[in-house]
């Protein structure tokens, strides 16, 4: 689970159905342009807004593209409850090389209960877990000690870590991680996290600029930093409104999906936000597009 993994949007048709053809085209484009793997049914994919039948369509399309390229597929499977997370994990394990399971949100369980949650989900399936730590969304912050306890579980292959910055707990975890793959999930922080020892990143922005993110991850200190600095304005613009609205609009403008639609309660982005993001995209260095 190293390198850059593109967190895929779920395209919709103008009639509001899942656009399997656009999803296949986007997934294939990402892999053909250097990303190491794909992520399906994450937050970027509006997984919570899909029906069970639509989620299965997404999984089938992404599995076929990933297997055809020999690339790993990470699949989102987790919610606030342990029993429901186990159910989702069992339903989706057959499609996945790893399951992305969020820290239980809103309830703010104890640290011990969070560790037990991941142990229970991991015991229910035969594929490894990537716990998803995103405290500014879940409302549950975990100290480095607990993050390392989670990483030490046999069922855990690594972690998607989104702290919204690089804090002391992040530094401690990276310095002490027991041979597990820490993947940065904050697109703007992937490069500095890589330099500090992260194994890679899970990036929504890599849907639009897969070559640039792949090159940034492979680059040495000078080249990687140059690409990071070039990508930062694009990442900031793509997240300037609730995601993935701006990203989908840019993907449609770039011809990578057919329609930019998002589902309620998300709304179409302001044209100015899309223009800013596209300008940053087109300003990327030659060879990075």
Predicted regions and their residues:
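Generic structural "secondary-structure junction" signal
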Residues: 6, 10-14, 51-52, 136, ...
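Short helix-capping segments at alpha-helix termini
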Residues: 64-71, 94-95, 124-127, 151-155, ...
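A general structural signal for well-ordered alpha-helical segments in protein cores
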Residues: 23, 55, 59, 85, ...
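Catalytic alpha/beta core domains of metabolic enzymes, predominantly
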Residues: 123-124, 135-239
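Structured C-terminal cap/extension of enzyme domains
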Residues: 31, 192-289
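Gly/Ser/Thr-rich helix-start
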Residues: 4, 17, 43-46, 77-79, ...
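Short secondary-structure transition/capping segments
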Residues: 50-53, 86-87, 111-114, 142-144, ...
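Active-site beta->alpha loop and helix N-cap motifs at the rims of alpha/beta catalytic domains
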Residues: 2-141
């Amino acid at each position: 689970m190293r390198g850059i993994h593109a967190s895929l949007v779920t395209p919709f048709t103008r009639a509001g159905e899942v656009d399997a053809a656009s999803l296949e085209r986007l997934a294939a484009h990402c892999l053909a342009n250097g990303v190491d793997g794909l992520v399906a049914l994450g937050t970027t994919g509006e997984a919570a807004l899909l029906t069970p039948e639509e989620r299965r369509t997404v999984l089938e399309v992404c599995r076929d593209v990933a297997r055809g390229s020999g690339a790993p597929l990470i699949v989102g499977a987790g919610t606030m409850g342990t029993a429901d997370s186990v159910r989702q994990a069992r339903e989706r394990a057959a499609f996945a090389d790893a399951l992305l399971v969020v820290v239980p949100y809103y309830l703010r369980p104890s640290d011990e209960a969070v560790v037990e949650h991941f142990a229970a989900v991991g015991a229910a399936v035969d594929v490894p877990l990537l716990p998803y730590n995103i405290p500014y969304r879940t409302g549950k912050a975990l100290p480095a000690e607990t993050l390392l306890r989670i990483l030490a579980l046999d069922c855990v292959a690594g972690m998607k870590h989104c702290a919204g910055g690089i804090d002391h707990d992040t530094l401690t975890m990276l310095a002490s991680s027991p041979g597990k793959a820490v993947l940065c999930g904050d697109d703007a922080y992937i490069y500095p996290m890589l330099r500090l020892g992260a194994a890679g990143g899970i990036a929504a922005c890599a849907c639009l600029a897969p070559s640039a993110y792949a090159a940034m991850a492979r680059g040495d200190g000078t080249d990687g930093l140059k690409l990071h600095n070039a990508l930062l304005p694009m990442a900031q613009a793509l997240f300037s409104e609730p995601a993935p609205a701006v990203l989908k609009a840019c993907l449609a403008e770039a011809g990578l999906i057919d329609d930019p639609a998002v589902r309620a309660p998300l709304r179409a982005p302001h044209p100015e936000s899309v223009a800013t993001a596209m300008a940053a995209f087109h300003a990327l260095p030659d060879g990075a597009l």
